[in-house]
Amino acid sequence: MSTGSHSPEAMWSATNFRRHQRKPNQVLHRWFFKGSAWIIYAIACGLHFFKLHYNERTNQVEESQYHRIWSKIVVVLKVILLASPYLQYFVLGLGIYIHITLVQDSKAQNFLMSLIVLGIVIGVLRRLLIFLHLKRDRRFLKHTVNEILHITSALEQKFGMEYKCDSTLLVVYLAKLWILTVMLDSLWYKPYFLSSIFLYWVLLEYCFAGYFIYQLILLSWYHTIILFLQRFIEDHANRLDIELHYHRRLIPLFELHLRINNLHKHVRDNVSWLSTSVYLMIFTCIFNAELLIECSLFAGDELENKIYIITDGCLGPVCVPILYVLILGMCTDRFRDAEVQLQQLFVIVQGLYMRKVRPHLLIAMVLENEHTSLIIHQKLKPLENMIILDITCDREFVMDYIVTVILTALSLVQYTISTGGNISECVTHK
């Protein structure tokens, strides 16, 4: 149905979208998202996180109860895993007492840094465990996942969902994952191994992986909307009127865009602790950057030993926090680019309606109002990642983060030298 004749390439129909979805890259991207989601879901079910069950019939997640006996066994195993190195905790407490009463100068500095890092690890681990088990967080996650499924389904039905996985983001994430795996393997065989530190890294990565997949889904939603508007503009550039079925699509498009923004605000407000935890890794990063500088520039070890000690000890804790922040910053920059492109396309669409549709028609007035509210909403509540204290995590922040790490680590090295500390030998920890 149309107010004018159809051209052979008139509209990007559902059939065309289904053909497009069978292309190898679309199949690959679709399987990546589905595979990642099922892996995260399977881990949650296996370890009794969240107590949510996916209902394939309704395409929604629902609260469920696990088997009572098996659930109790899993809880006992979790407690044992956390409490197993009790002797090491006792030694750690004794060491803290001795350092507080006896240690001074650069050794006191190193001890204080270690204590700060350990305190942050324990605090973040506590929040991670609460997030994975608390009923309030379960409700938040249930709402978020159901919104993601609903928006994806709506885009699929009305516009044709095009999945897009940013290759640069994925490469950076996989590089971080590889470095983290090497670091965890090294940590596992350390004589001072503590299961709480190991769990901190593993659970933080599990939660961040889910957040990263969510960010990629956001970018896919924007890509789908942008693609639809581009084809709308191409289709009507040389037409005298606008096809009727497009009227019924543009209003739901604005509604979905508003729903996407509200969802991201909801997610950002409820998992702000996760981005804060990522930022607080800066202490781990600084402390290990100091060790890396001392070992690479001042230690008298052989080059082969230096490389091994750096790789085995401090390289991972330096690189992983920076890569976490870099990923969040890159996502924010891509959100900004997508929103700018979306604004430009909406301006062009509104211009087409002003020229090709009578201005007193209801659709033209509604479209103008929706466009105005969208621009205001994007200005007041842009789609972005906040890191700490409502600071936006973008490329500028990432650069500030890296510079802060380097300058602070150099200051700590300078203080160690000025107090006569020993830096002539490589160490992986102090």
From Swiss-Prot:
Residues 1-31, 101-110, 190-277, 328-396 are cytoplasmic. GO terms for molecular function: ligand-gated channel activity. The chain crosses the membrane at residues 32-52, 80-100, 111-131, 169-189, 278-298, 307-327, 397-417. The keyword Membrane applies. Keywords: Cell membrane, Glycoprotein, Membrane, Transmembrane, Transmembrane helix. It is found in: Cell membrane. One of its GO terms (cellular component) is plasma membrane. One of its GO terms (biological process) is transmembrane transport. Glycans are attached at N422. The keyword Disulfide bond does not apply. Its main location: membrane. It is a multi-pass membrane protein. Residues 53-79, 132-168, 299-306, 418-430 are extracellular. Gustatory receptor-like proteins are divergent proteins which do not belong to the canonical gustatory receptor or olfactory receptor families but display some structural similarity. They are predicted to be ligand-gated seven transmembrane domain ion channels. This is Gustatory receptor-like 43a. It comes from Drosophila melanogaster. The gene is Grl43a.
